[in-house]
Each structure stands twice: as structure tokens, then as C-alpha cells.
A protein has these predicted regions:
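Metal-dependent nuclease catalytic cores in nucleic-acid-processing enzymes
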Residues: 175-182, 335-343, 431-435, 479-499
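Phosphate-binding site recognition
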Residues: 1-422, 437
Length: 519
């Protein structure tokens, strides 16, 4: 039986190595990066191993050879020189006031000044930072290594607060600008974050920064690949399958469906979310481990603010320029959602340079769509999961009347804000409901110009539904018959329901449905 200790939530490389935690060797890629450049930026979703990568770099630049015993870099590195390191972690503060950023910068600068001395004439954060870099280089006789974890956390937390975001930007831009000013004293700089802010970037002065976020050669630098699972966790896969009472192949398929699917460039291999994957191995159970550690409230607010058509999210198309930049004034919520890890690259059109996006895996898709429901429908967060269970039971038992009455209750008490965009609201609610039902039954969903048609299949029943806005239920049913939507099921023995539904803008609800049955 395997006795691996999984480093869940542990981001300190030294602790992982000294205390015998499981570690997947990323040091060959790290070494390649160090030897082929000086300034790097990497964006990955939260809990994807960015902090551990920084901690690994820190141990390497401290010359702690003993920690790398048995790892690839042990044979690659000959010198193991110790460099002065300035490690700034912006992850530990909640940025709700301009002082919160000032406090954390001041705290770090003060700690470094105790090591390398202070100069009274250096009043601003950027001057103090530049002075520290210069003095550290002189004192140590080696150039300085700078590591910044979650450089963008203040900016992300201020999305929607234009004034605060501007203050943070005005503080961070000159601060990071010191990296360019002090280039001669810097050996290596690595900044990580979830996002890359565009035109108004705090990096606009740092044009020598290599953004490796979409470089194919560094796809595996964070996260876990299928190859790495089989090379490092083969015994554990068999134990996991036995504990679940399923075959090895079935387990691999379920792990892939739940946690794989992150693509950070076109034609790249899929990466597994390490946080969810290691939790699943530790507990020998499937859960929404990553999703539950952070709620995407600010993303949902962005979607609502920009009146976004949710159905588009499953096949959104965009180019690299949009994907890679977040402009605080932008009306497009997609880059933030992509960079936060709720969407990923699903395809690429080489001719036009367009990326097709979608949800990476079931954990994210189901978690995100479930999370949306209380924001769009008349249902609270506590009741929400039970409502979906009831929907599923009703369609499985052929009880379409209860199903539609429940759907009506979702549209009750629609706010005035939503009324302004009636059609989009009703499409969004139906998309969420049928997407969630689709995790338990087969659903094909199509929408165009104010009408929605869908086919929902269970073991015993087939439902063909046509939804109209401000038409009649009779017209909707007629459409099903005129377009021969039931034709593919002619020989099917399951009971078939054709249902025409009308949604009234006046009552802001489902006004009527009529059903035609075929046994």
C-alpha cells in the first residue's frame, strides 16, 4: 500500500523536501528557464502551483543543493551560487483600501532595509526598492534575484472599483518599474499572477519581460500532466480504483473528465488541476476541491454587469490579444474568466488566429453553472442544489407539469434591472437550468433569435421542447411538427413528449405550455 504524503496547500519547497512530501520534479524546466532568460512572467489560475514554483526557485538561488538531491537539476547545475533574494508575496493581504497595499509594500521594504540598509532620501516605494536592489548587490557581491507572487492580487480585488484600481496601479507601476531601472543589479526576476492586465498595465515599462504563459515548452511548469500521473502515481491509481470499486481504465477516464482539460496554448497537452487531483488521491474520492476554495462572485457580477449571454461561454471565440490582457475599463468579461481558470482553450483557428474557449472539465463546469443559478433565478443558495435534484427527478419520472411549475417559480420576482433585457434573462435562466439537468440526462440545446429548442432524453422519456418569447405555445408546438424535430426518434420505444412553451414579456414568466404525447 502506498504511503505518499500529498502536499495539499503546502507551497514551501524546503518543507516538502525535508518532510518527505510527494513532489513531481519540475526542476529541469526551471533550470532551462534560468539559463535562457532573466525576466519572466507566468499567469496560471489560483492553486496551480505558482507559489511552489517560486519557492523552488528561491531554494535554487540560495544554493541549497541538498534539497535537490535526486532531482533533475542536481546533475545540471555545477556551481550552486548563493544570490541575495527579494521575495514579495502579495497573496497575504485583502486589498479593500489603498492603505492595504501601502502597508504590505512598506512591511517588505522595511524587512529588506534591515538586511541591506536604508537611505533617508529614498521616500517613495519605488526609490526604496531600487536602493535596496543596489545595496543588496554590492553587499553580497552577486546580482539580486527578485520573486513576486500574485503581483495582480490588488488589481483583481479592485475590479469594479475604478478609483481603487487606479490608486493600486499608480502605486505598483513605478514600484515594478524599478526592475528596469536597476537592470544591471538583477540576475533574475520572476513574477506570477492570475491575470495579465492590458493597456493600463503595471508592466508597461517592463518591455523586457518574457511572458511564458502561452509558451508550449513551459506548459508543464505548473500543474500535472497525464504523463506525470502515470510516471509518479501508477500504484496509487490502482489503489484508488480498488477503493472506488471500478476498473483502472474507468478511474483514469473519470479523473480526466473531472480534473484534466486545462490548455494554456493551442495544440498543447491538457494539464490537470494539481489541487483537485492530489485531494482526490488523498481522499480516494471525487469532489469539487478547487472550486470550493474560492467563489467566483466577482466574475458573476462582471457577467451580469455586461449583460453577457451565458450560452456563448461554452463556445466563445477570441484572439490572443484579448485573452492575454485585461483592461479595467473593458466590457468583455471573458479574459478575466479565462485567466481565472473557469474557461480554457478548446480549439484554434490557425487561419484567423482565433481561439475557441470552453469549460476545462466537469468540476469547473458544474461548479460554475451551479454557482450562477441563485444570481439569475428566484432561488437562494441553500435551496439551489435541491431544486436541481427535483428537476432531474421530475424529468426522469415524466412529470413535466411539476417541472414547468418549478421553472415558473424561478422567474418569479424578476428584478427591474433584469426586465430591461428580458430576452437575454429568460435565455440565461433556461441555459443554466438545462445545463445543470444535462449533468444527469442527455440535453441538446440550441438558441437563435428569441427562440430555444432542445431535446432532453432520459432512460424512459424523450422531451422535445420549443420555447418562444412573446409568441404562443401553439406556434411553438407547430414549429416542432413543421420542422420534424421528432423524426430521429421515430423508431425509439421511449415515450416522447412534444412541448410548446411561450414566455410572456408582460408577465415576465412562462405563460403557457402545451404537450403532445407519443407512446
Amino acid at each position: 500500500m502506498s504511503h505518499k504524503i500529498y502536499p495539499i496547500g503546502i507551497q514551501n519547497f524546503e518543507k516538502i523536501r525535508n518532510d518527505g512530501y510527494f513532489y513531481i520534479d519540475k526542476t529541469a524546466l526551471m533550470y532551462q528557464m534560468v539559463k535562457t532568460g532573466s525576466y519572466y512572467f507566468l499567469s496560471r489560475p489560483r492553486r496551480f502551483g505558482k507559489s511552489l514554483l517560486l519557492s523552488t526557485l528561491e531554494a535554487y538561488f540560495q544554493g541549497k543543493k541538498e534539497l535537490f538531491e535526486g532531482l533533475a537539476v542536481e546533475k545540471l547545475e555545477k556551481d550552486w551560487i548563493k544570490y541575495p533574494i527579494l521575495h514579495l508575496d502579495l497573496n497575504i493581504e485583502k486589498y479593500d483600501t489603498s492603505e492595504s497595499l501601502d502597508n504590505i509594500l512598506d512591511k517588505s521594504l522595511t524587512a529588506w532595509e534591515k538586511l541591506y540598509g536604508a537611505e533617508p532620501s529614498e521616500r517613495s516605494f519605488s526609490l526604496r526598492f531600487a536602493g535596496i536592489i543596489e545595496r543588496a548587490c554590492k553587499l553580497a557581491g552577486q546580482r539580486v534575484v527578485i520573486l513576486v507572487d500574485e503581483y495582480d492580487k490588488p488589481m483583481l480585488q479592485a475590479i469594479g472599483n475604478e478609483e481603487l484600481q487606479k490608486q493600486f496601479r499608480n502605486t505598483l507601476k513605478p514600484f515594478y518599474g524599478a526592475l528596469k531601472t536597476m537592470d544591471g543589479c538583477i540576475k533574475f526576476a520572476f513574477l506570477t499572477g492570475v491575470t495579465k492586465f492590458g493597456k493600463v498595465s503595471v508592466f508597461s515599462d517592463l518591455n523586457n519581460l518574457d511572458d511564458i504563459s502561452m509558451w508550449n515548452e513551459y506548459v508543464e511548469i505548473c500543474g500535472i500532466s497525464e504523463r506525470e500521473i502515470h510516471n509518479n502515481l501508477e500504484t496509487e491509481l490502482h489503489e484508488f480504483a480498488a477503493a472506488r470499486g471500478i476498473t483502472y481504465d474507468k478511474l483514469c477516464e473519470e479523473l480526466r473528465e473531472c480534473y484534466d482539460g486545462y490548455h494554456f496554448t493551442h495544440n498543447s497537452i491538457g494539464m490537470y488541476n494539481p489541487f483537485s487531483l492530489l485531494n482526490a488521491f488523498k481522499r480516494k474520492d471525487f469532489g469539487s476541491y478547487w472550486f470550493e476554495t474560492g467563489t467566483p462572485t466577482y466574475l458573476v457580477k462582471l457577467l451580469q454587469k455586461h449583460h453577457y449571454d451565458l450560452e456563448r461561454m461554452t463556445h466563445e471565440e477570441t484572439d490572443a490579444q484579448v485573452l492575454n490582457s485585461i483592461d479595467s475599463e473593458s466590457t468583455n468579461p471573458i479574459p478575466v474568466i479565462y485567466q481565472s481558470g473557469y474557461l480554457t482553450i478548446k480549439g484554434y483557428d490557425e487561419e484567423f488566429g482565433m481561439y475557441r474557449l470552453g469549460f476545462p472539465n466537469r468540476e469547473v463546469e458544474e461548479g460554475f453553472v451551479r454557482f450562477l443559478l441563485p444570481y439569475y433565478a428566484n432561488v437562494n443558495k441553500v435551496e439551489s442544489p435541491f431544486e436541481i435534484q427535483k428537476f432531474v427527478r421530475e424529468v426522469r419520472s415524466g412529470d413535466y407539469s411539476s417541472f414547468f411549475r418549478r421553472l415558473q417559480s424561478f422567474f418569479a420576482d424578476t428584478t427591474y434591472e433584469v426586465i430591461r433585457d428580458q430576452e437575454l434573462h429568460y435565455e440565461n435562466v433556461l441555459f443554466i437550468v438545462f445545463k445543470l439537468v444535462g449533468f444527469y440526462a442527455k440535453v441538446e440545446y440550441h438558441t437563435s433569435e428569441g427562440r430555444i429548442d432542445l431535446v432532453l432524453q432520459t432512460d424512459k422519456f424523450i422531451y422535445i421542447m420549443e420555447f418562444k418569447l412573446n409568441g404562443t405555445a401553439e406556434e411553438a408546438l407547430q414549429q416542432i411538427n413543421d420542422k420534424h424535430y421528432a423524426l430521429p426518434f421515430e423508431m425509439d420505444e421511449r415515450k416522447l413528449f412534444k412541448i410548446g412553451v411561450n414566455f410572456s414579456a408582460e408577465t415576465r414568466n412562462i405563460e403557457k405550455w402545451i404537450v403532445e404525447t407519443k407512446n
